[in-house]
Amino acid sequence: MFIDKIKAKANNDEINVIIEIPMNIGPIKYEFDKESGAVFVDRFMQTTMSYPCNYGFIPHTLSNDGDPVDVLVVAHHPVVPGSVIKCRAVGVLMMEDESGLDEKIIAVPTSKLDITFDHIKELDDLCEMLKKRIVHFFEHYKDLEKGKWVKVTGWENKAKANALINEGIDRAS
């Protein structure tokens, strides 16, 4: 995959997300290597948990932790690692871990990909149980890994998510 050819934004309202970890596939953490374009197994998580959403990043962005901006893509199906999915941001999960601040943009597929998410405009439109599952996952997925921890500090709205995306684009350029 030539990541250089994939833009951060498909248009003003849509972001391109490169999927690293499919939802509900088991306790495996994959990482996309930006230089080679390969997906590597980063580690086998010690908890028996799987990601509640497809997990990836926005190319050509840089968050405060030095990595590309992270995104959780709410979907009905797992998406293959390395796939690019066009999404709309609806909010952000605010958290910190042993390395510092680590926000996760929450996004849904665009109408062209799945019309069943058209009614979700903001974070409050998501099912409350899904939000609880996301928080539970991130509060516990590192529990059995020595020296690792996560603290979820709350949720922010779509405007904050878009601000973090734009800051990430600016920081990377």
UniProtKB/Swiss-Prot annotation:
Binding site for Mg(2+) 2: D70
Positions with a binding annotation for substrate: K29, R43, Y55, Y141
Gene3D superfamilies: Inorganic pyrophosphatase
CDD domains, per the entry: pyrophosphatase
Signal peptide (from-to): none
Binding-site residues for Mg(2+) 1, renumbered to this chain: D65, D70, D102
Database matches in InterPro entries: Pyrophosphatase, Pyrophosphatase_sf
Keywords, alphabetical: Cytoplasm, Hydrolase, Magnesium, Metal-binding
Location relative to the cell: Cytoplasm
GO CC annotations, alphabetized: cytoplasm
Recorded catalytic activity of this chain's protein: diphosphate + H2O = 2 phosphate + H(+)
Known EC number: 3.6.1.1
A GO biological-process term: phosphate-containing compound metabolic process
Function: Catalyzes the hydrolysis of inorganic pyrophosphate (PPi) forming two phosphate ions.
Subunit: Homohexamer.
Family stated for the protein in its record: Belongs to the PPase family.
HAMAP family: Inorganic_PPase
Matches recorded under NCBIfam families: PRK01250.1 (NF002317)
Protein name: Inorganic pyrophosphatase
